[in-house]
C-alpha cells in the first residue's frame, strides 16, 4: 500500500516541501535561520492573538489595557514579554538570514529574493505599528517622527501624512488603524512566506560551496528536520 503522505492531495504538498525534499548535503547552521523565522512568526501570531483579546485601541484606555494584561490576565505578563522579545529575536534571525543570503549569493534567485525583500519591509512595517500600540510617550513620538518622514515628498507629502494620521495630528484614528494593520499584516506575511518557499523549491537552495549540488542531495527529513529542531531548542 502506497504511503498516504505520497498520495493524499494535501499531505503530498507537505511531503514534497518538508519530507522528501532533495536538499544539499553540506548546508551549515547559517541555513537554520529560515526555520527559526517560521517559528518566530508562529509565536508572534499566537501571542498577538491572545494580547488582542485584552487590548483596546483607544487613546484613553490603550496604556491601561496593556497594564491590565500584565497585572490581571493569567500569564498576561509572560504573553506580552514573549511577544515583545519575540519581535527582537525575529529581527536578529531576519538580519542573519539576509546576511547569509548576501554572503552566499542567494540574490541570484530573483523571485525568491524579491519576495524576501517584500517580507522584510512588511515585517518592519508591522513592528513599527506594534511599537505605537501601547500608547506611551515613545509610542506617540515614534508614530509622529516616522510618519512625518512622508512629508518630505514634494506637493503631496503633507496631505499624505494627514491621510495616514486620519486628522491633523497623531490621535485616536491613527491608533485604531495602526492596530488593524498590525493585526492583519502577520497573516499577509504568512501568505508571502508560502510564496517565498514556493519560489525557493522551484530552484532549490544554494550551499556554502557555491557550486550546483544536483549530484549530491539528501532528503530533508530526517537530516534537516532534526537540525532545525536543534536550532529551535538552542
Swiss-Prot record:
Bilayer-crossing residues are 33-53, 77-98, 113-133, 178-198, 226-234
| PROSITE patterns reported for this sequence | CYTB_CTER, CYTB_NTER
An example GO CC term for this entry is: mitochondrial inner membrane
GO MF term set: metal ion binding; ubiquinol-cytochrome-c reductase activity
Membrane topology term: Multi-pass membrane protein
Q: Keywords of this protein's UniProt record, alphabetized?
A: Electron transport, Heme, Iron, Membrane, Metal-binding, Mitochondrion, Mitochondrion inner membrane, Respiratory chain, Transmembrane, Transmembrane helix, Transport, Ubiquinone
Tell me what effect the entry lists for residue 154 to H.
Answer: In strain: Isolate NK 4504
Q: Where in the cell is it found?
A: Mitochondrion inner membrane
SUPFAM superfamilies, A to Z: Transmembrane di-heme cytochromes
Chain residues that bind heme b b562: 83, 182
Entry similarity comment? Belongs to the cytochrome b family.
Q: How does it assemble?
A: The cytochrome bc1 complex contains 11 subunits: 3 respiratory subunits (MT-CYB, CYC1 and UQCRFS1), 2 core proteins (UQCRC1 and UQCRC2) and 6 low-molecular weight proteins (UQCRH/QCR6, UQCRB/QCR7, UQCRQ/QCR8, UQCR10/QCR9, UQCR11/QCR10 and a cleavage product of UQCRFS1). This cytochrome bc1 complex then forms a dimer.
Q: What does this protein do?
A: Component of the ubiquinol-cytochrome c reductase complex (complex III or cytochrome b-c1 complex) that is part of the mitochondrial respiratory chain. The b-c1 complex mediates electron transfer from ubiquinol to cytochrome c. Contributes to the generation of a proton gradient across the mitochondrial membrane that is then used for ATP synthesis.
Q: Which PANTHER family match?
A: CYTOCHROME B
* Record-given protein name: Cytochrome b
Amino acid at each position: 500500500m502506497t504511503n498516504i503522505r505520497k498520495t493524499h492531495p494535501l499531505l503530498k504538498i507537505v511531503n514534497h516541501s518538508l519530507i522528501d525534499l532533495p536538499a544539499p548535503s553540506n548546508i551549515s547552521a547559517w541555513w537554520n535561520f529560515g526555520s527559526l523565522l517560521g517559528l518566530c512568526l508562529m509565536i508572534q501570531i499566537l501571542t498577538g492573538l491572545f494580547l488582542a483579546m485584552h487590548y483596546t485601541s483607544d487613546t484613553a484606555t490603550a496604556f491601561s489595557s496593556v497594564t491590565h494584561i500584565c497585572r490581571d490576565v493569567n500569564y498576561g505578563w509572560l504573553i506580552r514579554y514573549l511577544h515583545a522579545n519575540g519581535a527582537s529575536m525575529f529581527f536578529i534571525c531576519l538580519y542573519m538570514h539576509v546576511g547569509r543570503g548576501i554572503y552566499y549569493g542567494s540574490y541570484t534567485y530573483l523571485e525568491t529574493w524579491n519576495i524576501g525583500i517584500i517580507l522584510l519591509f512588511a515585517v518592519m512595517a508591522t513592528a513599527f505599528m506594534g511599537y505605537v500600540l501601547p500608547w506611551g510617550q515613545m509610542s506617540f513620538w515614534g508614530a509622529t517622527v516616522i510618519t512625518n518622514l512622508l512629508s518630505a515628498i514634494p506637493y503631496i507629502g503633507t496631505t499624505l501624512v494627514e491621510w495616514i494620521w486620519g486628522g491633523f495630528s497623531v490621535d485616536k484614528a491613527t491608533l485604531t488603524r495602526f492596530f488593524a494593520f498590525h493585526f492583519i499584516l502577520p497573516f499577509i506575511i504568512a501568505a508571502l512566506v508560502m510564496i517565498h518557499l514556493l519560489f525557493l523549491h522551484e530552484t532549490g537552495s544554494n550551499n556554502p560551496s557555491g557550486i550546483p549540488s544536483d549530484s549530491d542531495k539528501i532528503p530533508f527529513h530526517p537530516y534537516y528536520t532534526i537540525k532545525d529542531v536543534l536550532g529551535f531548542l538552542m
